[in-house]
Each structure stands twice: as structure tokens, then as C-alpha cells.
A protein has these predicted regions:
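Short glycine-rich anion-binding loops that position phosphate/pyrophosphate groups of nucleotides
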Residues: 57-59, 102-103
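An acidic, glycine-rich surface segment that forms the CoA-thioester-binding/catalytic face
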Residues: 32-36, 40, 44, 66-101
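Amphipathic alpha-helical interaction surfaces in cytosolic regulatory modules
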Residues: 58-66
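Hydrophobic/aromatic residues within transmembrane alpha-helices
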Residues: 16, 53, 65, 111-113
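Short glycine-/acidic-enriched loop or helix-start segments at secondary-structure transitions
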Residues: 62-63, 71, 108-109
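Crotonase-fold acyl-CoA enzyme core
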Residues: 90-157
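Conserved CoA-thioester-binding segment of acyl-CoA-metabolizing enzymes
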Residues: 1-56
């Protein structure tokens, strides 16, 4: 597994941590692949009952790594296989909890919405900041967000 994603076990709980604090845990291609691999391993492990997805150093996830996109190393965007943020197309049989501190914006919001439950710090920030650059939520986030909080509140974001 990559150093950009850490997976740790404590009994039946698997904690998956996005570990790119200098980039506010923005997800590049390597990190997306590592996230997908971590959740595949969690799903296949019969002794794991629940997963917690979090980010290192007080940041959940600032979305896709725009610097990597600018350098031609953007996330995988294809109609099949893993999603651009890694596990966002997976249908797991076990619950995943998002433990959100700091920013969960753009693709980070999509990751949080993909989880079955979200637990947020008092100062957590959720947002669709990608719309500022004309980039939509691209991997089910629009549908998940409106189902979670309703269309009116989703439009406010």
C-alpha cells in the first residue's frame, strides 16, 4: 500500500487515513488507487466489521489534486472501474463512517457522501467548491448529496 493512504486495524474496526497533509489530503491518481485498494481489502476481510475514513493532520479531503491535473497526472476518469476519487463507485456490504475534520470539499465531499455515516467536528467545512472552476461533482456526488440533505440545501452549497 502507498504511503498516501494508511490502513490500521483495532479489533473489528479498520481506519483508512488519507495521508497527504501538505496537500490538505487532496487525492491524486496514486492516492485514489490506494484508497480503492484499501476498501477492497476491507470488504474482503471477514474479521473487519466497520471502516472509518479520515484524513491526516486535521484535514478530511480537499478534493482532487488540481496541481496533478495541471501537470497532466490527473485522476482516472473512465466510465468503468474505480472512480476518480478511488472507492466512490464501490458498493460495500459493511458500513463506512466518515470522520470529518477541516475541509470536505469537492471530491472530498463526494467521499464523505459515499460513506454510510458522517461524523463531523464542530469546525468541519462541507462544500462544492469545485463549481467555482466550472467542475461538477463527477462521481455520484450530486445524487448522493441531494438524497442526504435535500435539493434546496444542496443547491445552497
Amino acid at each position: 500500500m502507498s504511503d498516501t493512504v494508511l490502513a490500521a486495524r483495532d479489533g473489528a474496526v479498520t481506519t483508512v487515513t488519507i495521508n497527504r497533509p501538505a496537500q490538505r489530503n487532496a487525492v491524486d491518481r496514486e492516492t485514489a488507487a490506494a484508497l480503492a485498494a484499501a476498501f477492497r481489502a476491507f470488504e474482503q476481510d471477514d474479521t473487519a466489521a466497520v471502516a472509518v475514513l479520515t484524513g491526516a493532520a486535521g484535514h478530511f479531503c480537499a478534493g482532487a489534486d488540481l496541481r496533478a491535473f495541471a501537470e497532466g497526472r490527473g485522476n482516472r476518469v473512465a466510465p468503468d472501474g474505480d472512480g476518480p476519487m478511488g472507492p466512490t463507485r464501490m458498493m460495500l456490504s459493511k458500513p463506512v463512517i466518515a470522520a470529518v475534520e477541516g475541509y470536505a470539499v469537492a471530491g472530498g465531499l463526494e467521499l464523505a457522501c459515499w460513506c454510510d455515516l458522517r461524523v463531523a467536528a464542530a469546525d468541519a467545512v462541507f462544500g462544492v467548491f469545485c463549481r467555482r472552476w466550472g467542475v461538477p461533482l463527477i462521481d455520484g456526488g450530486t445524487i448522493r448529496l441531494t438524497r442526504l440533505i435535500g435539493q434546496s440545501r444542496a443547491l445552497d452549497m
